[in-house]
């Protein structure tokens, strides 16, 4: 879809696949990715309705393990906020949630418009401090069933992709790891097209640009197909040179 957006010309995914396959550029995956989730029973229909939060572990050579706290919008898959922590406490969760509310402007809206929070049953997520903070913010807290990680499939999958990418290189300082995480989040939010989002980026969906982009892509596709038909008709309308010479003789 980036080719369509940048070159203003439509090429189907099937055509791209055939070309890559012919050049032996389609490789088998190094591992089979297991789906992290089925479908959430109460699906979101717009951004800022439900936020998923979770921790994951990342190692810094010579420093030990650090904890990455992430807040992800359920509908758009947009990473709203993240924070690298040396601990995994309730205060680390709220320290990530605070900028998530501010960045979206949700700290200024009425309570009934606040997003719900979906988390697992980790110690930091069932702590009384977090419950008090959520109550003060007017946010509803939903916790997944124990030993049922697929409830948070989107954020679990995002963390796994991040670790697969980042663990290819060692980080020797917290600042270096933060730079890697920042680059990954920037790529996933603003550059990577998600098939589940109609080949839009998370930012396109989160900030409401998706419908306009899809409409423009549809227009480009119609224009491209019309041009191809005209070119085909023009080519078939011209007599073959050998046949033309035979007719003249």
Question: Would you name each region that the model predicts?
Answer:
Residues 48-49, 78, 86, 90, ...:
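Retroviral integrase
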Residues 16, 54, 71, 77, ...:
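Mobile genetic element proteins and their domesticated derivatives, centered on retroelements
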Residues 60, 64, 83-109:
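Active-site beta-loop-alpha junctions of metal-dependent nucleic acid enzymes
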Residues 97, 108-126, 145-147, 198-203:
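Acidic/histidine-rich, metal-coordinating catalytic segments
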Residues 30, 114-121, 135-154, 168-174:
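RNase H-like polynucleotidyl transferase catalytic core
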Residues 128, 135-139, 160-249:
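C-terminal domain-tail junction helix/linker
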Residues 1-50, 148-149, 206-210, 215, ...:
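Basic, flexible linker segments flanking DNA-binding modules
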Residues 52-80, 86:
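An active-site-proximal beta-strand-loop segment
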